[in-house]
Structure formats: structure tokens, C-alpha cells
Amino acid sequence: DELEELTDRIIQETHLVDDVPARLDLLKYSSVGVIGNRDKVTDLLKNILVSLSTLHFFRDVRIVGVFDPEEEEEWKSLRWLPHIWDDELQTRYLNFDPLTEESLASLSLNSEKGYVDSYAKFREKVNSIIAERKDPDFQAKWKNGTSPIPHYIFLFASRKKTECFLSMLSENDPAMGISTIFLYDEQYYLPNFCQYIVNVDDPYDDRTATAFYKYRADEKMWFTMDQPIPQRKFDAFCRQMSAI
């Protein structure tokens, strides 16, 4: 009938909407995988981080970055963001150290050599955050569906250095107040518990990406990525944010 035809026409006309921000809900989806061409993944994440750190006070949102040493030049500017520090402003939740035998050993074994591998110390710090957030006593303080503050966002760009954290994050429990973003080349490498996927590779348009809930891959959202932020401007932004 006419009403049904009108409905179909409206759906077709509004299938693509211009100038509307694409939303990535890190409270609804505790684990997100961003996959595809590494340069485009990097560009997208920089835009996300600029929006995130601009709109959220560093006491409300904390960022934890785990990267391989090869990407240090690309991401070392993050050290200026206030969101990357711990509560005491003594430790940055940012690591580029190589994975070594000492990193995989326990802290007690490393101490026999008179030092503790820097990645092992970083791992211990992050594990303590996760353990606290899994504690029922901690979660009891945040009732009625309220997310704990600060909300932690883990950026996992190193597959090997990420493995030691996966078992503690696999529940996707919103009560923990932790979201994870995995930056991998292919969907195949994402952990099984990853809920939401953003694919930056589109065969027809270099600036188009798709996003979808893992178990509803047929219901994809297409969006146009923002223009890349030059490294110089990204560094300048992070340095300006350090004054907050």
C-alpha cells in the first residue's frame, strides 16, 4: 500500500546520512578490534584519542598503551597526555619496551639479577589495576549500572605483549570499568572475546571504513574516516594537553 511504499522510500533516502559523527560506544562494547592497513588504523586511532582526551577529563578516563618498540616514534607523543598518568602522576601507562626473557619471568626471579625488567614492572602495574577492578568489594561501590571512575581504555597494539593480559579481560564485564582496543592487521588475530570490529580497509574507497557487532556482521555501519592528523600536529596537541 501507499504507507508501506512511503516507508520504504524514507528508508532508502536516509540509508546514508552526511555530517553525522560515527559513534564508538566503549561502555556498551568492552572490547573493540580495529583492523586493516596499519597506517589507516593509526590515523583512525589518533583521531579517536584527540576526541577522547578533549571531551573527557583525565580524572575520569585513563589511557593505557602497549606498543612494540618499532612504533615508538609514532606514539611517543602520548606521554604528554595527562590521561596516560597514574593517580599519583608518577607512572605513565605507556610501554614500548621489547619483549624479553626477563619480561616473561616473574618479578622475583628478575630481582635475583639485581634489576627488574621495565616491561615486567609495567605489566605488574597493569595487572594490579585489572585485579582491583575484578575485586567484588570494588565493584560493590559502583551499583545501579554506573561505570567506575576512572574508566580505563587499554590500547593493545602489540600482539605478543598483550597475551599476558587476555585471560583477565576475557569476561567483558562492564562493572570493571575497562575497555580494550586491539590494533591488529587482521580479524583472525583478534581474541575470541572481542565484541565489536572496525575495519578500515574498503576496496572501493580509501577513506571509508565499516563497523559491526561481531555476531551481527550483516548489520554493518559504513562511515568516512576523518582526515589524518599529521604527526607534528598530533605531537603539538598532546603537548598542549599536558598543561591541563
Task: Kindly give the residue locations of the regions a language model identified.
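Accessory regions of macromolecular translocation/handling assemblies
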Residues: 1-244
